[in-house]
Amino acid sequence: MAVALITGANRGIGLALVKAYAGRRDKVFATARAASDRAELEALADTSRGWIEVIELDVSDPVDLARAKRRLEAEPIDVLINNAGVSGPDRQSALDMDFEGLAETLAVNAIAPLRIANAFLPNVKAAKGKIITLSSQMGQMQSASSDSLAYRVSKAAVNKLMRGLATELKPQGVPVLILQPGWVRTEMGGDGARLSPEESAAGMLKLIDKLDIASTGKFLAWNGKELAW
């Protein structure tokens, strides 16, 4: 049995990952914000016979994070998955930027994954586990596109932060992987997306399972394709 900690687990890809892990009898600590719609996650936990435990966590709130860290202090974590994210403000072009919204997007999508990785690193080390962060091809530096710029910047930032984390944790034997879940039919991805959350989660689960220190620091799509930065 593995133990997984998944952020942003109340819907979409996060919820699909919770179902995938719990479905094979792995223990899942599933986090969601207090204000989020988490009825489906709570119902799933209630019928999971203890395989799923819901933890209240706003990933950008240090007080919430400290509380979650205390709750999980004695729990080895085999897989830490940074999934929580936001799409950014309504105005996010270079010439019409909601700067407060930009800061909030960076806080959730880029800074929080690193903060969470540091907070739960002792748990991951105790299990000889691994750290996974979901990102996006929209953060690729080779793209000149400027739509959804706050979101793009946040994903470029988290890619670099996770590569840095991978470099620093490699001597300690903790692998770090950046995953692109594909274009998924979620609230963020829209109804026209190609993949269901379950298809994306199943593909990523295979990659997570076989991740070792030799593959640390890579940026992979859900189907295993290596992506450019």
Short names for language-model regions:
Residues 10, 14-19:
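N-terminal Rossmann NAD(P)H-binding glycine-rich loop of SDR-like oxidoreductase domains
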Residues 86-106, 111-115, 125-170:
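Catalytic loop of short-chain dehydrogenase/reductase
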Residues 22-40:
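Conserved glycine-rich Rossmann-like NAD(P)H-binding loop of the short-chain dehydrogenase/reductase
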Residues 55-67:
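The beta1-alpha1 cofactor-binding region of Rossmann-like NAD(H)/NADP(H)-dependent oxidoreductases
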Residues 7, 77-85, 109, 133, ...:
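Rossmann-fold scaffold of SDR-type NAD(P)-dependent oxidoreductases
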Residues 32, 175-181, 185:
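Conserved SDR Rossmann-fold cofactor-binding beta-strand/turn motif
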Residues 171, 178-181, 190-229:
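C-terminal helical subdomain
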Residues 64-67, 112-119:
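Conserved mid-core alpha-helix of short-chain dehydrogenase/reductase
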